[in-house]
UniProtKB/Swiss-Prot annotation:
Region (Disordered): 48-85, 232-277
Organism per entry: Ajellomyces capsulatus (strain NAm1 / WU24) (Darling's disease fungus)
Protein name: Small ribosomal subunit protein mS23
Compositionally biased residues, Acidic residues: 244-269
MF annotations from Gene Ontology: structural constituent of ribosome
Amino acid sequence: MGRYNLTALRVRRTALATTQCGKPGTRQPWLDVLADIPPASILVRNQAPSHPVVKQRMRTVPGKSKPQLEIKSSAGRKQTSKKPSRIFQPKEIRYEEDQLRKEFFRDHPWELARPRVVLENDGNDHRRYNWQNIQQPGKKLDGESVVQRQLYLLNNVPDMSKGAAYEIARREFYQLRLQEDVERRVAQEEALATGAYFGPDMHTVGMELENQEYEKWKVWAEGENQAMEQRLAAFTGSTGPTEESGESEDEIPLIEEEDAIGASEESETEAPSGPPI
């Protein structure tokens, strides 16, 4: 059967073979039950079911006094080219607010940098929220508030489009953000008026003073090092590298002894002989 594991289906056969071989032990009481009710053997693997996106809308129907609830489900795009090894993988679970959340954070990427509180008491905080208003008690205003407010407008306001719901939720979000900024500035001005200090802390000031002292010591150390080199040069007689050639006296190449002897012999042979005395 290839890689299928049929060990569980052959438990009764293995137990009977063990008993017939004469191994010590009593006959298991579940052998007869297993013979009457064998385990299920499903060798056909079904593909994972897809999860359609369910959308709820309120539509105005001609001839009706009240808007009618309309529920649509879309399966999404079909993936025709898929590897055989990925056919049986679980399908992605998608919700309508996923696309709304993607659009909002695409327009407001810095909202992701704000700290968020994801801790809940019992996991049912979302059931106590009423998204008729974007601001909820006990919940900090963030991008998720805009998404849930937009979804509420789409599900409960008749003939509401996604763009119009996004504009309404976004306008309310901007107004509350502006109100928070004003409250923050007013609180800072009140604190400054009562003697609060919002400058750098003690550690930052200490590090700045330490950096200044280090720079002063660095200039003093360079001067001391230069004076020490000048005193050593006065004792050794070295004047340092020349400016024209760029070579010091210690780096002047020395003439080897053999070359000097050969040069003196050549000069003696080439010199003319004078008159005898």
